A protein has these predicted regions:
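Prokaryote-biased recognition of long, low-complexity C-terminal linker/tail segments
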Residues: 128, 132-191
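Intrinsically disordered, low-complexity regulatory segments
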Residues: 2-133, 137, 143, 162
Length: 191
């Protein structure tokens, strides 16, 4: 049959201004931004739009879809969002493999699972994405408006911020290092 490959996340969560026009302008008075219902959108890029049209057409005419996304939360989320955006109506099965050997791939296709078996994994990924959106969009705007200088964006994120804190703390340790005297012990062993 037909084959397709989805290589990227074509459909992320919507931007703040996609939910409310007043959220386009960065203002403390608009915080916190909490959409009544989160939605996805197609990335505005001619290459992505063209690729999505092909995928959408194939999905509309398919008798069955096999989700071959990465075996994990993010792979599940990326593929589900594309299928949702494309309006896929046919049955969906899941290829779940963690090895790319010929044998593993063959076994995976012989043991396809119902997409519904992965609903909790999708919901976990969706919850993570929404949490990242809420923290990132709101905290970035808050810190930028309060502390950013010369229109400098201060980006805040669930992974990025603690990682940067580790780097800053380590740099401070290096800069504040004070050598201390120490002794070396030398011993002689006898048989």
């Amino acid at each position: 049959g037909s084959e397709m490959c989805i290589r990227d996340s074509l459909c992320p969560l919507k931007e703040p201004h996609d939910y409310a026009q007043e959220w386009k302008r960065w203002a403390l008075s608009s915080l916190p931004m909490v959409p009544p219902r989160f939605g996805i959108k197609l990335i505005s890029n001619p290459t992505y739009e063209q690729q999505f049209k092909v995928i959408e057409s194939l999905m509309q005419n398919a008798d069955m879809i096999i989700n071959c996304g990465d075996a994990g939360q993010e792979g599940e989320l990326i593929q589900r969002w594309v299928m949702q955006k494309a309006g896929a109506k046919c049955p969906v099965y899941r290829l779940w493999i963690s090895s790319l050997t010929e044998e593993a791939i063959r076994d995976g296709f012989q043991q396809l699972k119902e997409q519904t078996e992965f609903n909790k994994l999708y919901e976990a990924g969706l919850s993570r994405a929404i949490g990242d959106w809420l923290l990132g969009m709101n905290a970035t705007r808050l810190y930028t408006l309060r502390y950013g200088q010369n229109r400098q964006v201060l980006s805040i994120g669930r992974v990025q911020t603690p990682t940067l804190a580790l780097i800053v703390n380590r740099q401070a340790e290096i800069e504040n290092f004070k050598p201390e005297p120490y002794w070396e012990l030398k011993t002689i062993y006898r048989n």
